Every structure is written in structure tokens, then in C-alpha cells.
Amino acid sequence: MRETLTAAITAVIESAMADGRVRLEAVPQVSVERPRDPSHGDWATNIALVAAKPAGMAPRDLAAIVAAGLVERLGADAEAVEIAGPGFINIRLARGVLADVVGRVRSERERYGAGPRTGRRVQVEFVSANPVGPMHVGHGRWAALGDSIARILAHAGDEVQREFYVNDAGVQMDIFAASVSARYLELTGRPFEFPEDGYRGAYITDIAREILDAEGERWADATAADREAHFKEQAYAAVLGHLKRVLHGMGVDFDVWFSERTLHAPGDAGAATAIERGIDRLRSAGHVFEREGALWFRSTGFGDDKDRVLTKADGTYTYFAADVAYHADKYDRGFDLVIDIWGADHHGYVKRMESAVAALGHPGKLEVIIGQMVNLFRNGEVVRMSKRTGEMVTFEDLLDEVGADAARYFFLRRSTDQPLDFDIGLAKQRSSDNPVFYVQYAHARICSILRKAAGAETTDESVDVDAVAARITADPAALALLGAEPGTLAGDAELGLLRKLAEFPEVVSVAARQRTPHKITSYAEDLAAAFHQFYTHCQVVVDDAQLRNARLALADASRIVLAGALGLLGVTAPQRM
């Protein structure tokens, strides 16, 4: 409808320009938005305010021309076109247009709100936790965020790949191996020296014990170098497997697990490594120089505040050099847009990476989202330690306590650029105070209504709700009964629910464009509220067959859209609660 109204407004102004009523060189960009106050109508535009000055007209005079033209063009589709304030134009759609959304939803089903195929290939890289220990709750937030953004972009028409960058090269892996080695020696009763900056979590001892149980004490008498080289691979595999299991338990599965080691590995027949090739690309484009024995990237040429080291004076590569190579590889794989989701501690890294991508020939094709941290609360108190382990609360601890649905939903309720206060007690409540329960309960309630309408017991597990819904037929004459009594509680509740269903495609479009899954959670809660209002004021199963079918169809459309919204968040839509 936004596109229809935009085209209509443009055509009205062009017609007025052609006959001399409006003097403009070109039609300004037309903006059509949902009013914040539903009483102002279904859509609004400020085009008269935008175009009045270049047209040399008073805004309300121009608004009058546009409004009159819209009334003529929209005809019976518009209930009212009104001028408000200094020159805003509010548009209220006819009930028939609103009621049409029910048929559209029930026809398109899970494709409702989906965009056309864009042909754009998008990679979303997220979580990318070091494989040296369990994930913290911040990783959980970024997992929910990245996966939901991927789902929303795919629904909007993009081809999306999810990728996890495994930081399995570098000194942290050596420290990790030395830590496991020390705990292994401790378990065998041998003398050991724990690394000063080693990893001290109980999970290190757990990994060492797994190795001891599987392979015995044969590594106790090996050289430290041999033991640590072996343990590095064993411990790495154990942690990586654990990360995959925890993420899968939250419904997050990656298409690619990209190993940093591959960037350091030489190519076939001793060919250059990916890092060397990445640096060579920058060098051939004239963006590399030497200073003080080191090799530098001239990132100041792309807006960075200082140049960045690629190769240190001792010949070793910086982490930045590996990141340059990694991003070069991403674009070599044909992605049109790369979205990286990083923790707040990487904020200062953004500009240098954007500079490198531009220097590689892909300006504007990298988008970095900074995910803020999560603060856990229980009974109003900050939670820092796990009751089970006495150590930091991990992402897995939280999942075990509140479940995947609640964790995902709560992680996504707030804008990414804001720290998140996660109330554990609230996430576990089975009441309307818990937003995810509130939304899921609305879906389950609709399923119960549909089962009851089919004459089945609401607890009958054998009833296929989709099959029941498919037998509900509501022709245009029946749907025209919805909202037929505006100004009454029932009529207003029906209209409110219809309007909310009609908003979903635009909500998805905005969430995809802005990378804002929290707009989907807000919408889901509003839709659930609109349905609960409808259910309170409208008896669904009534004697009048036409009205009954119309209201059942409206309930079914609400079920479909609630499930669709929850699906974009990676949250289940239960049929019973």
C-alpha cells in the first residue's frame, strides 16, 4: 500500500504541474509513513510541507490540491483524506481494503511480508568467539541478533549466508594448550607449572580429564612441546564442538565455520598465503609503505585517524593483517554486502576495517554492527556468578535456566546499540508480564479457538490446526462484516486488528533495511495485544455463519502473522501452552 500511495501522490503532483496549478521543476521524494497516533488514519505524508517552498505556495494550499487528487485517484479505497496541522495529509483506508488483508495473509501464509528476490548476496558474520572457552551471555545476544538479521534479510529477498570466524591461530591458542597441559599434569599427580596468563576456568580441568580418560597418562612423560601440540588440537576440537552444540540448542546454525588458520597456510606448491596475497593487493594499489622496519597500511587515506601496521618489524603479522585477508576472501566469494557483528570492545576497530575494505576495492560494502553487553538481573540484583559453578555465568547457563525461546526474545527486545538488562525471573514467568509468553500465548489461544470451532476438544493432540484453518472459508461479503460497526468495542477491535495485520510487510521491510530485529518484537507484542483486545470484545464462534467465518478467518490470519513474526526472531509458535 505504501508503494500504491507513493505512486498516487507522485501522479497527482505531476498532473498539477502539467496544468500549471503547481510550479515545480521535479516532484520531490515522496514520504508515506504510518502515523504515530492511529486516530490520525492509516497513512500520512508531509509532501505538502516539503514541496511548498520550492513551489512558492502555502503548505495547506498545496495539501488541498494533493488531497483532492488523492480522493479522486483512490476512489472507494479511501474512507477519508484529511489535511491536518500546517499541511500534513492523513489517509484513512476503506474497511474493504483493510479486510482484504485477511485473504492475502491466508493465501500467502509464511510468505506474507516477504520481499521479491533481490539477487543480492549477503554474508552475516557473528559470534566468532575464541575457541578457548565457553561463550559469555554477550555472545548469546549477538547470536540471536545475527541469526535474526539473517532471517529478516532472507525474508526481505536477499540470499544470506551465516558465518562464524574461528580465531584458531595466534598466541591465545598456545596459552590455551599450556593451560590444559598443566591441569592434565595436575590430575596425574605430576609436577606442573600453570601459565601466568593461563585460562583458569573449571572447564580447563574438565577438558584435561576427558583427555586423561581417553588416552591415559601417556602424555605425562612427553616433552612439553609435544604434549601441548597434541592437547591444542584435542582441546580446540572439544571447545569448538561445545560452541556448536550450545548455538544449535538456541536454534543458531552456521553455513560456514571459517578457520583463521587457513589464512596463514601456504597455497598449493608453496604459493603465497592468504595474508600475503591480501597485503599484496593493498601494495599493488599503492596503499602500503614501510616505516621503522614495519609494513604499514595507509588507512588515513580512507578517513582513519592513523595508519595501521600490517607486518611488525620482527616479520610477524598483526591481527589486522589477518582481518584484511579474511575480508578479501569474503568478497572473492562474491558477496555484495558483508555484515560483521562485533562486541563493544571492538568499536575502535571499525574505521580501520572499513578503510581496508575500501582499499581492496569494495567501498560501502562492509557494515559493522556493534553489539552492547548484557547485564543479568535476578530479583532486582545483578547476577555475576553461576550458582552451579561459582564462576562467571555463561551463555549455556542462561539457556539452561530460561530456555532458548525466552533467551532469544529477550536478547532481541532492545536496540543493539543499547546495553541490555536481562531479568531472569521475568523471562521464566508464565504470565502476561513476560513478553515472550504474552506473544506465544496469543498464538496458542488462536489455535485453541480454531480447534473449538472444528468441534474438537482444545486439548486434543491429534487435531491439525492448519487443516482446521483450511476449512474456514470467508468470501468478500463475509469479510466486509469486519469492522462494520466502527465506534463500538467490537467494531474498533476488529479494525484495530486488521490495521495491525496490514502493517507487517512494512515492519519487515524497515527491520531489514535498518537491521533492527527489535522492531519485530515490538510489532509482535502490539499484534498480540490487538488480538487479545479483539478476543475480549468479539465473540468469535457465533450463530451467524458469515460473521463466524469472517472472525475465524481474521483469527487465523493473526495466527499466521504471529507465527511469521516469531519465526523471524527464531522463536517457536506453540499451538498449546
Residues of each region from the PLM?
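Non-catalytic interaction-recognition regions
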Residues: M1-A99, R106-E110, A114-M577
